[in-house]
Swiss-Prot record:
The keyword Methyltransferase applies. It holds the Pfam family PCMT. One of its GO terms (cellular component) is cytoplasm. GO terms for molecular function: protein-L-isoaspartate (D-aspartate) O-methyltransferase activity. This is Protein-L-isoaspartate O-methyltransferase. Catalyzes the methyl esterification of L-isoaspartyl residues in peptides and proteins that result from spontaneous decomposition of normal L-aspartyl and L-asparaginyl residues. It plays a role in the repair and/or degradation of damaged proteins. It catalyses: [protein]-L-isoaspartate + S-adenosyl-L-methionine = [protein]-L-isoaspartate alpha-methyl ester + S-adenosyl-L-homocysteine. The gene is pcm.
Amino acid sequence: MTSQRTRERLIQRLCEEGISNQRVLDVIRKTPRHLFVDEALAHRAYEDTALPIGHNQTISQPYMVARMSELLLAAGPLDKVMEIGTGSGYQTAVLAQLVERVFSVERIKGLQDRAKERLVELNLRNVVFRWGDGWEGWPALAPYNGIIVTAVATDVPQALLDQLAPGGRLVIPVGSGEVQQLMLIIREENGFSRHVLGAVRFVPLLNGPIA
């Protein structure tokens, strides 16, 4: 279930799917995904698939975690990254091992509390959490070198663009229902460059915190 061989099979699949950043692969290899899902689903933790985590939310497919992390890091090391949608905390844990500091925003208090516990268990101390509306980001601590959004937005939130540092990278799924596209947005000297990277499937980015 959680054997090294099972994890290696996942890494092999990610490589076959085009993930090439060795740091990202190493971090996913050593991060215990089974700790981020319900015990009843632990036997499926190293399958390359999204799994339910309650509250109508999911833990992202490992390929998508790797892909989004790789896109974020493509221009070099990052000091300060904001994550919109803590969820189970799995993507958070991966980011915490790849960048200096992670600022993670989650609207569902129950999910955030459990994610905090998991990161403490893994001794990942470079993450700060905010319970709030992901559409608003975390303006008090802006700007960020990177922003990653783990739910699909109907449009790119202006607040997130405003909080992106010069040269910063925003990785976000945009669309609705069956039509969703992963986008990479880079803050350039004279505005933003936008790159559409292909079809994806995420749960929606909703407004407002809930207990």
